[in-house]
Amino acid sequence: GTGIASNIRRMLIEEGASEEEAQSKLFAFDVPGLLVDDTPGLTEPQKLYVQKRSNFATWKLESPGTITLMDVVRNARPSVLIGVTATNGLFNAEVLGQMAKNDERPIIFALSNPTSKTECTPEEVAVATKGRGLVATGSPFTPFMYEGKEFVTSQCNNMFIFPGVGLGALVSKASKITTKMFLQASKALSEFVTDEQRAKNMLLPDLTNIRKVSACVAKAVAIEARESGLGRILSDEELDRVIAKAQW
């Protein structure tokens, strides 16, 4: 979870946010609740994402002393939830319904595997958000119908990123793989989702396009390697050719 938070924080800063602004937008949880400055037993990675308890003095809490997920969803009004908790049902109807009040198209990542441990199911998101929630899961789910519309669930899997990152590093002869390469890979992936796929509430491309996705990701990584002085100086056109030649 802290690894995900680290990359989101880096992306926010890349997009122009200050370190303080980026930090303020991230609310990290563990078993005791929201990670705050007086949470006992914090690990070193967790300490990077604690909030000051004093920041929430005016919040209405479900239980004094503990800041729950529902407390944050109701008071901070986030638009994105990311679950890697292996806690089935954590994103319940109340939480999902509040997310739909926070944003017209709330984004829900229920990434825990297997399905018996997922934070919520895609159908639960559809019902609680009246079809407006965008969801991706760690486990595969079959398409379903809600209110006469087909919903296709994106499986958030490293197969969309890792092969392309490896290919991009290989063709560019990158001396190392950096966090920024992964950020550029993520941007390339996000731009690959079509309007038709978004209409089905998909957050990621269809798996049938995985070869093209990997080539697109590879090019983004190779360009970053070139721009950062870590890889070969090849034009965009040359990169297209060497990437196509390297795939099989």
How should these model regions be labeled?
Residues 1-2, 34-37, 83, 88-92, ...:
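Flexible loop/turn segments at secondary-structure boundaries
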Residues 64-131, 173:
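Long hydrophobic segments that form regular secondary structure
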Residues 247:
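Active-site loops and adjacent core secondary-structure elements that bind or stabilize anionic groups
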Residues 1-80, 232:
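Glycine-rich phosphate/diphosphate-binding loop of Rossmann-like nucleotide-binding domains
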Residues 17, 23, 60, 64, ...:
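Alpha-helix capping and helix-loop boundary segments enriched in small/acidic/polar residues
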Residues 3, 29, 83-85, 102, ...:
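Generic beta-strand/beta-sheet core signal
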Residues 106, 110-236, 242:
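Adenosine-phosphate binding glycine-rich loop
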